[in-house]
């Protein structure tokens, strides 16, 4: 099994190009079921993308892959979909597999999807996915670990209030509603840029969607959608991770190919800590200027601070000048990186959904183990900050969400190798 060996202590200097957003491309790939052909560009080279390709192919899709140096193009032909079951062997690898449920059900009137897998960071129940589809007229039962869904005729437009903000359920509801009969109004929706990107792709395909980027989305169902071509937006989580990498290594890095407005809340949080962050053409520049203040943080649905960056921010705060409180409001069990950071000398105490981080002068290299995707990259950041050797095990998590991570960091001076 592969591992990463990191010899830290070198400030990162240079530029990093951001890849396409994993959390946007996966639902867009699922949306291909709604039409006959979808051409997607700026697709990141990630194992989660490969898993979604395998899933779509298992349903009968034909996928042409055009490989470029930094990205894929995908041409997905779904006119011959003939299998409506998403099997456990594929779905267990990735929670995003649940997003084929809405498209299969709304276009073909039936779907059988295994309960999903992915990172072990909490329950992430599918209750809201099921509730909104039932509100559209679907008949759904959970049997033997599968969601069995069917509808008599087309799904029907509905008014539905999510009792809590759910990115995943918002996506499934939108994917189902675009081909439902009549108007669907969704309240308390997720507002994430990746949801906006999905909606923009669906509009390119001929969907009628209003309220994009707000908590109230109105969808007028169509009889069918068109072939389309769409470029996926860049990954704000990857961008934020490298912004924190620049800060924790006391470096100076230009983060390129990212719109500043979708990382603005990350930039503002870094500025609070004393890091210099300025917008540049098609990106942002992050520069350490000699201090790192302790800052409290709460994760919240967008436009709040993303839970997917909480672990990376915690790594940064382990070296701050005071005490910070980090509150995780999205997922339970998302402090699994804390024991590993403490092995490296961090002073962190977890109390429920809060972590108290007391800054230390320096971290020390150690052998550590990744528990999930975001935890793994937080340990890399910690390793980059030390003047000694860190060995990270179970790095297969990284390849689910970060393209060419070692290469991008090495190009900025990091000593990081996969063995």
From Swiss-Prot:
Q: Under which name does UniProt file this protein?
A: UDP-N-acetylglucosamine 1-carboxyvinyltransferase
**Record-listed UDP-N-acetyl-alpha-D-glucosamine binding positions:** 95, 164-167, 308, 330
Provide the coiled-coil residue spans: none
Chief localization class?
cytoplasm
Kindly state which keywords UniProt assigns to this record, in alphabetical order.
Answer: Cell cycle, Cell division, Cell shape, Cell wall biogenesis/degradation, Cytoplasm, Peptidoglycan synthesis, Pyruvate, Transferase
Q: In which pathway does it act?
A: Cell wall biogenesis; peptidoglycan biosynthesis
Pfam families in alphabetical order: EPSP_synthase
List this protein's GO terms for biological process: cell division; cell wall organization; peptidoglycan biosynthetic process; regulation of cell shape; UDP-N-acetylgalactosamine biosynthetic process
Gene Ontology molecular function, alphabetical: UDP-N-acetylglucosamine 1-carboxyvinyltransferase activity
Query: Sorted alphabetically, which NCBIfam families does this protein's record hold?
Result: murA, PRK09369.1
Record InterPro entries: Enolpyruvate_Tfrase_dom, Enolpyruvate_Tfrase_sf, MurA_subfamily, RNA3'P_cycl/enolpyr_Trfase_a/b, UDP_GlcNAc_COvinyl_MurA
Catalytic activity entry: phosphoenolpyruvate + UDP-N-acetyl-alpha-D-glucosamine = UDP-N-acetyl-3-O-(1-carboxyvinyl)-alpha-D-glucosamine + phosphate
Q: What is its EC number?
A: 2.5.1.7
* Organism from which the protein derives: Rickettsia africae (strain ESF-5)
- Which residues are catalytic? 119 (proton donor)
Query: What cellular-component terms does GO give this entry?
Result: cytoplasm
User: Which PANTHER family does the UniProt record give?
Assistant: UDP-N-ACETYLGLUCOSAMINE 1-CARBOXYVINYLTRANSFERASE
Similarity comment text for this entry: Belongs to the EPSP synthase family. MurA subfamily.
The positions annotated for binding phosphoenolpyruvate are: 22-23
Which cysteine residues pair off into disulfide bonds?
A: none
Job of this protein = Cell wall formation. Adds enolpyruvyl to UDP-N-acetylglucosamine.
Modified positions (2-(S-cysteinyl)pyruvic acid O-phosphothioketal) in chain numbering: 119
Q: Where in the cell is it found?
A: Cytoplasm
EC category name: transferase
Q: Which Gene3D superfamilies match?
A: Enolpyruvate transferase domain
């Amino acid at each position: 099994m592969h591992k990463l060996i990191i010899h830290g202590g070198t400030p990162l200097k240079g530029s990093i190009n951001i890849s396409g957003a994993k959390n946007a491309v996966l639902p867009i790939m699922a949306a291909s079921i709604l039409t006959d052909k979808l051409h997607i560009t700026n697709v990141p080279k990630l194992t989660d993308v490969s898993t979604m390709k395998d899933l779509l192919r298992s349903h009968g899709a034909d996928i042409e892959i055009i490989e470029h140096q930094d990205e894929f193009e995908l041409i997905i032909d779904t006119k011959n979909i003939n299998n409506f079951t998403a099997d456990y062997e594929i779905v267990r690898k990735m929670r995003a597999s649940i997003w084929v449920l809405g498209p299969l059900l709304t276009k073909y009137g039936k779907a059988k999807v295994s309960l999903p897998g992915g990172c072990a960071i909490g329950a992430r129940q599918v209750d809201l996915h099921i509730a909104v589809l039932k509100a559209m007229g679907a008949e759904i039962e959970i049997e033997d670990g599968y969601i069995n869904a069917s509808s008599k005729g087309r799904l029907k437009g509905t008014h539905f209030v999510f009792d809590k903000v759910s990115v995943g359920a918002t996506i499934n509801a939108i994917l189902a509603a675009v081909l439902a009969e009549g108007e669907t109004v969704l309240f308390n929706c997720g507002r994430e840029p990746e949801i906006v990107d999905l909606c923009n792709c669906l509009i390119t395909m001929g969907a009628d969607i209003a309220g994009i980027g707000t908590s109230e989305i109105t969808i007028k169902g169509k009889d069918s959608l068109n072939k389309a071509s769409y470029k996926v937006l860049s990954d704000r989580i990857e961008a934020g991770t490298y912004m924190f990498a620049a800060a924790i290594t006391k470096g100076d890095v230009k983060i390129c190919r990212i719109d500043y407005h979708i990382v603005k809340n990350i930039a503002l949080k870094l500025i609070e800590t004393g890091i210099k962050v300025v917008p540049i053409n098609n990106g942002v520049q992050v520069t350490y200027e000699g201090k790192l203040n302790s800052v409290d943080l709460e994760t919240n649905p967008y436009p709040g601070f993303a839970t997917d960056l909480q672990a990376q921010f915690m790594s940064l705060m382990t070296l701050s000048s005071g005490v910070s409180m980090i509150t995780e409001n999205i997922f339970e069990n998302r402090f699994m990186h804390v024991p590993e950071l403490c092995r490296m000398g961090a002073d962190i105490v977890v109390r429920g959904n809060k972590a108290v981080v007391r800054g230390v002068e320096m971290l020390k290299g150690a052998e550590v183990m990744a528990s999930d995707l975001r935890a793994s990259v937080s340990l890399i950041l910690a390793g980059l900050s030390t003047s000694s050797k860190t060995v990270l095990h179970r790095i297969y998590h990284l390849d689910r969400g970060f393209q060419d991570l070692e290469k991008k960091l090495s190009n900025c001076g990091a000593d990081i190798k996969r063995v």
